[in-house]
């Protein structure tokens, strides 16, 4: 996983509440097992008019000024529903680095973090301000300081200390384990021979 320290990008507002994992990535795309390639299917039912991938010009992700946005501003209960990690894969593959919501489905919140996406919880008044940013306005998210810096104000956010450490250092669960490789080897060496 890449380190997440300070990130600057532009925003796209999708202010719906209760966007569930089936809306983020419909079930028919769960057959793929590689993390790459899911971005094409993100918000499939909203982004496309038909199965030929004809873009819906009214959907905000398809509007030219928002195509490069990497910070999603959204409503409450983002990522509720089934526990499919594929939804986080789709968000990451599309290019999202930060998601600002009123709340998250618990499992989806962890899936985002495990895939290098920073989920940030903010109240409605903050999200409403961020949703009014121009498509070219840059927002900086500083994980060290736990702050969002934007043209409409600066906002603090909370994050669990363990997750913060993992993101700042680019560590997934395997990376955390490998930090203790010497101790693990020593433990294995000291085990009785009948375990070898």
Swiss-Prot record:
Assigned keywords, A-Z: Amino-acid biosynthesis, Branched-chain amino acid biosynthesis, Leucine biosynthesis, Lyase
Pfam families tied to this protein: Aconitase_C
Origin species: Streptococcus mutans serotype c (strain ATCC 700610 / UA159)
Pathway connected to this protein: Amino-acid biosynthesis; L-leucine biosynthesis; L-leucine from 3-methyl-2-oxobutanoate: step 2/4
Protein name: 3-isopropylmalate dehydratase small subunit
InterPro entries, per the entry: 3-IsopropMal_deHydase_ssu (IPR004431), Aconitase/3IPM_dehydase_swvl (IPR015928), AconitaseA/IPMdHydase_ssu_swvl (IPR000573), IPMI_Swivel (IPR033940), LeuD (IPR050075)
Subunit structure: Heterodimer of LeuC and LeuD.
Highest rank taxon of the organism: Bacteria
BP GO terms, sorted: L-leucine biosynthetic process
